[in-house]
């Protein structure tokens, strides 16, 4: 096979798929095999989590990141997020494991046995990186698949058993979403919101109607855009504006993935609707507000007048007013005054927290939930001795929110660097001055061996 070495491809073995830039068949094999690795990890890791799973303990105490995703989709859980059946977790793991074998076979086939280039095999699957019309057609197929993916969530929510709704009355429960939000003013209003504070841009979505309605919109938009890109050829301005090369497309993709990674970071850190706290543990603001509530309850039982007690700063010790006049929790948690959560909202009135409800109407389940969330804040250090930094070493808890937010932030940053790197190379190559490092006269080649 050609393009296995530096002489035939211009790239050394460690440059990986760069050797396959012009071998569409081999590149297909690499991508299908990569998909197989991804799906294999999903299946194997789900089964690993299930093998270690203790139904009596919260998922977030067991370091789980995959089973919570399955549970959020409404499989295997019931009222309050309690696991009622672990079999769906097993099924999801096995289905991914089996499909990864199919992908693995396809990847190996196209890497070893299949045609090196698809062009001589099929005009439909073949392509040339510089063929602008073919590239936008491929873009169209990708958009249609993404749209179908979005609509699959809609189908699960509306027709196949529903999703887990942490806001369901009487405590979270699996609920069929029968009335998704289709009003474009609501859906696109999220995109126009400020990203700061309680506004929170799209991350502020706090009900499943809006989530499912948004997926209906984005699914239909992606499918319509896909059909458009298949049927049309790029306009002159687009032909002139973009760089049309394999490396340019790589940079566009990395840029998009970077953006998605940063958005996912904010979602898993702040949003407790699509990442229910029953599965992922409390958000940072949630744990802080829960601590304020826990000690308010304790001191109120001991006789404190929580409505008028003054703290060491002269502000209210337990309750104070927000910048816009609502009654909020006092102390350091004041910065999280726009937190919303299903365990706290029943205590609100028309002007923030309702003093009458706080004095007379806090339910035992709210007290327990606040204490649980207070002690499971998403704090943690590198060596996994979690909890507050001053905590004794017997505490060993790191929230899945910490792991997921940190990993997605770091990966999103790496992808952003990769985007800039490949965009710069692609633009330089298009402008005709891209040289790279001259491998013939690379200094290291003339240096003596390290040993």
Swiss-Prot record:
The record lists chlorophyll a 1 as bound by: 418
Instruction: Enumerate the residues binding chlorophyll a 5.
Output: 138
**Binding-site positions, chlorophyll a 9:** 211
**Topology term for the membrane:** Multi-pass membrane protein
Keyword annotations: Chlorophyll, Chromophore, Manganese, Membrane, Metal-binding, Photosynthesis, Photosystem II, Thylakoid, Transmembrane, Transmembrane helix
Q: Which residues lie on this side of the membrane: Cytoplasmic?
A: 1-46, 134-155, 254-268, 450-451
Q: Which GO terms describe its biological process?
A: photosynthetic electron transport in photosystem II
A cellular component term from Gene Ontology for this protein is:
photosystem II
Q: Where does chlorophyll a 10 bind?
A: 106
Summarize where chlorophyll a 8 binds, as residue positions.
Answer: 92
> Which residues are involved in binding chlorophyll a 7?
404
Residue ranges crossing the lipid bilayer per the database entry: 47-71, 112-133, 156-178, 233-253, 269-290, 425-449
Q: Name one GO molecular function term.
A: chlorophyll binding
Report the sequence similarity comment from the record.
Belongs to the PsbB/PsbC family. PsbC subfamily.
Xref: HAMAP family: PSII_PsbC_CP43
Write down what this protein is called: Photosystem II CP43 reaction center protein
Which species is this UniProt entry from?
A: Thermostichus vulcanus (Synechococcus vulcanus)
């Amino acid at each position: 096979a050609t393009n296995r070495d530096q002489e035939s491809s211009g790239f050394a073995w460690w440059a990986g798929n760069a050797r396959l830039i012009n071998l569409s068949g081999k590149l297909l094999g690499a991508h299908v095999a990569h998909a197989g690795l991804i799906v294999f990890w999903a299946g194997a890791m789900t089964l690993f989590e299930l093998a270690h799973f203790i139904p009596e303990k919260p998922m977030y105490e067991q370091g789980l990141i995959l089973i919570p995703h399955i549970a959020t989709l409404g499989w295997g859980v019931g009222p309050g997020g309690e696991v009622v059946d672990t079999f769906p977790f097993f099924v999801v793991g096995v289905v991914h494991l089996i499909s990864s074998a199919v992908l693995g076979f396809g990847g190996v086939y196209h890497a070893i046995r299949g045609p090196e280039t698809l062009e001589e095999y099929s005009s439909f699957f073949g392509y040339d990186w510089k063929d602008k019309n073919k590239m936008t057609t491929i873009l169209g197929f990708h958009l249609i698949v993404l749209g179908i993916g979005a609509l699959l969530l809609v189908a699960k929510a509306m027709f196949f058993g529903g999703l887990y709704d942490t806001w369901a009355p009487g405590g979270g429960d699996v609920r069929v979403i029968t009335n998704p939000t289709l009003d474009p003013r609501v859906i696109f209003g999220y995109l126009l919101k400020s990203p700061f504070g309680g506004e929170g841009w799209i991350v502020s979505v706090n009900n499943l109607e809006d989530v499912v309605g948004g997926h209906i919109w984005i699914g239909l938009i992606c499918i319509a855009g896909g059909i458009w890109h298949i049927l049309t050829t790029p306009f002159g301005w687009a032909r002139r504006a973009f760089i049309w090369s394999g490396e340019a497309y790589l940079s566009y993709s990395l840029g998009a993935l970077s953006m998605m990674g940063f958005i996912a970071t904010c979602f898993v850190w702040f949003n407790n609707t699509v990442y229910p706290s029953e599965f992922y543990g409390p958000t940072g603001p949630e744990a802080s507000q829960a601590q304020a509530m826990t000690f308010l309850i304790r001191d109120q039982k001991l006789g404190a007048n929580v409505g008028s007690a003054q703290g060491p700063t002269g502000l209210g010790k337990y309750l104070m007013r927000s910048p816009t006049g609502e009654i909020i929790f006092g102390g350091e948690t004041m910065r999280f005054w726009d937190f919303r959560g299903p365990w706290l909202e029943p205590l609100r009135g028309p002007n923030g927290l309702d003093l009458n409800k706080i004095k007379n109407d806090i339910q035992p389940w709210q007290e327990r939930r606040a204490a649980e969330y207070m002690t499971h804040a998403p704090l943690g250090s590198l060596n996994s001795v979690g909890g507050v930094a001053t905590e004794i070493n017997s505490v060993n808890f790191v929230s899945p929110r910490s792991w997921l937010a940190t990993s997605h932030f770091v990966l999103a940053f790496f992808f952003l660097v990769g985007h800039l790197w490949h965009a710069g190379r692609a633009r330089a190559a298009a402008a005709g001055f891209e040289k790279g490092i001259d491998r013939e006269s690379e200094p290291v080649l003339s240096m003596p061996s390290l040993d």
